[in-house]
Amino acid sequence: MLKPLGDRLVLKVEEKEQTVGGFVLAGSAQEKTKTAQVVATGQGVRTLNGDLVAPSVKTGDRVLVEAHAGLDVKDGDEKYIIVGEANILAIIEE
């Protein structure tokens, strides 16, 4: 299993038509974003004082991420992307 460092996240991209809360996103919105599930999170980042700031998302969250963000990786037969937390646009709450 992949364990990201810092504020990075491992995401499993959903390969189906994108919806947010049951609403299908318009074609142009689908081209700019993708829906993914958070598979793993890094510990977060440290402030200048040394305090740890944990990620805003947790494993299992569904998120909306920028379409071209991240690095494509494989772990066995599974495909994932690794992104920085700044590339997450929203958490999808259902």
Swiss-Prot record:
CDD domains: cpn10. It holds the Pfam family Cpn10. The keyword Cytoplasm applies. GO terms for biological process: chaperone cofactor-dependent protein refolding. It is found in: Cytoplasm. Disulfide bonds: none annotated. Its main location: cytoplasm. GO terms for molecular function: ATP binding; metal ion binding; protein folding chaperone; protein-folding chaperone binding; unfolded protein binding. GO terms for cellular component: cytoplasm. Keywords: Chaperone, Cytoplasm. Belongs to the GroES chaperonin family. Heptamer of 7 subunits arranged in a ring. Interacts with the chaperonin GroEL. Together with the chaperonin GroEL, plays an essential role in assisting protein folding. The GroEL-GroES system forms a nano-cage that allows encapsulation of the non-native substrate proteins and provides a physical environment optimized to promote and accelerate protein folding. GroES binds to the apical surface of the GroEL ring, thereby capping the opening of the GroEL channel. HAMAP family: CH10. This is Co-chaperonin GroES. It comes from Streptococcus pneumoniae (strain ATCC 700669 / Spain 23F-1). The gene is groES.
